[in-house]
Amino acid sequence: IIHTAAQPSHDWAAKEPKTDFTINANGTLTLLEATRLHCPEAVFIFTSTNKVYGDTPNNLPLVELNTRYELHADHKFYYGIDETMSIDQSKHSLFGVSKLSADLMVQEYGRYFGMNTGVFRGGCLTGPNHAGTQMHGFLSYLMKCAVSGQKYEINGYKGKQVRDNIHSYDLVNMFHHFYQNPRQGEVYNAGGGRHSNCSMNEAIELCQEIAGKSMNVEYFETPRIGDHIWWISNISKFREHYPEWCYHYTLKDTLRQMHKSLTIKK
C-alpha cells in the first residue's frame, strides 16, 4: 500500500483547516485501520513531508552567498538534515501539522501493532510529468513558466532559499527497497540531498539555460508562513538500511525531462 493521497498546499490549508486535517490526518487513519483489519501483513508506505520539522531549520546558522543560503561545511547538518531534528515547538503551517499527525500515526501503527509501516519525509518530490502550481511543486511550475512565458513570483529570502529535489523514479525506487525488506514503524528523510539541490535563483538560471530564453520573474519581500530558508535532506539512514539503493537522476536531468515533456504538450 503506497499512500500518496493528500491535500498538499500550505495556503489552501489555512483557508480550510478542517478539510485539510480531514484529508491528511483522518484519511490516513482510515487507511491504516483498513489495513490493520483486512491485510495487517501488508507493507504500508506513507509519503510524509519535511514540513513535519516546522520552521526549526530556519534556526540554523545560515550564511548568505551570492545565489543561495548555505551552511558551513563543518556543521553537522551540512550534508543534510536528518531524522534527529526536533518536530516540536515550531511553526509548521496547518498543512504541516495535519501531515505530522498522519506521520506519527503511521509510525505508531508500525510500533504498536507490529505492522510493516514506513514513513518517507519528502523534500521536493518531482519528475517530468509533475503538474506543479504556484502554491506547490515549484520546480515543475518554474519550468512551466520558463516555457510559456508566464510570470513567476518569488516570495522572500532574495530568491536564495534552497530546496533539494528528488526524481520520482528515485523515490519509487526507495519505496521498492523498503517493500522488499520492511522495517516496522521506520521513518526516513527522502530528498535529493547534496546530490540534487538548488536555490530559487539557481533554478531560474538553469530553467532559462534549458529553455533558451529569459524568464518573467517578480520578487515579493514577504515569505510564505512557515517556509524553509534552507532544506537539504540527509538520507544516510536510508542508505545504511538499504545500501543497494542509489540516485539515478541529477537536477539537470530532471529539468531537461520537464522541458521535453512541456514542449511536447505544447
Regions found by a protein language model. Name each.
Residues S236-K237, Y249-K266:
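Amphipathic terminal alpha-helices
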